Amino acid sequence: MSEVAETWVDTWMAKLVNYDYKHFIRLVIIVGGYLLLRNIASRELAKKQLAAQVEKDKRDKEEKRSKDLIDKPDDAATAETTSFGWGKKTRRRVKRQQELFENALEEAKRRNQGLDPDSDADIEELLEE
């Protein structure tokens, strides 16, 4: 061992030998209290972290649910139509597909009305009175 280590060990051994029961009890109380408070604090922090994680998961789940409840026309157009069922989900899907089909028909009619060859609507704005 080095000279510094020997000096350090000798110093601590001398201090421990000179301690009486009162000092040892005090040391045990301090160390025991530290360990007890540390365990309690770590448990409480773990509870807070778990509660925060549960709250975050609830918010994420609610946000996902609200996004799922919003009708997305693109999703309905690409949805699979091969499966047929009798439940509420199938009825909603069929209703959504019917609405999309009706909207597509109305838009096609509007486009065709503007392209009617017998219509003078496209040249009316060019005519001067």
UniProtKB/Swiss-Prot annotation:
Modified residues (Phosphoserine): S119
PANTHER family associated with the record: PROCESSING OF GAS1 AND ALP PROTEIN 2 (PTHR28199:SF1)
Predominant cellular place of this UniProt entry's protein: endoplasmic reticulum
A Pfam entry, by short name: PGA2
Modified residues (N-acetylserine): S2
Region called Disordered, residue ranges: 53-92, 106-129
Skewed-composition ranges (Acidic residues): 117-129
Gene Ontology terms describing biological process: protein transport
Keyword Secreted: no
Bias kind Basic and acidic residues: ranges: 54-75
Organism listed in the record: Saccharomyces cerevisiae (strain ATCC 204508 / S288c) (Baker's yeast)
Membrane-spanning residues: 23-42
Family note: Belongs to the PGA2 family.
Residue ranges of coiled coil: 43-116
Protein name: Processing of GAS1 and ALP protein 2
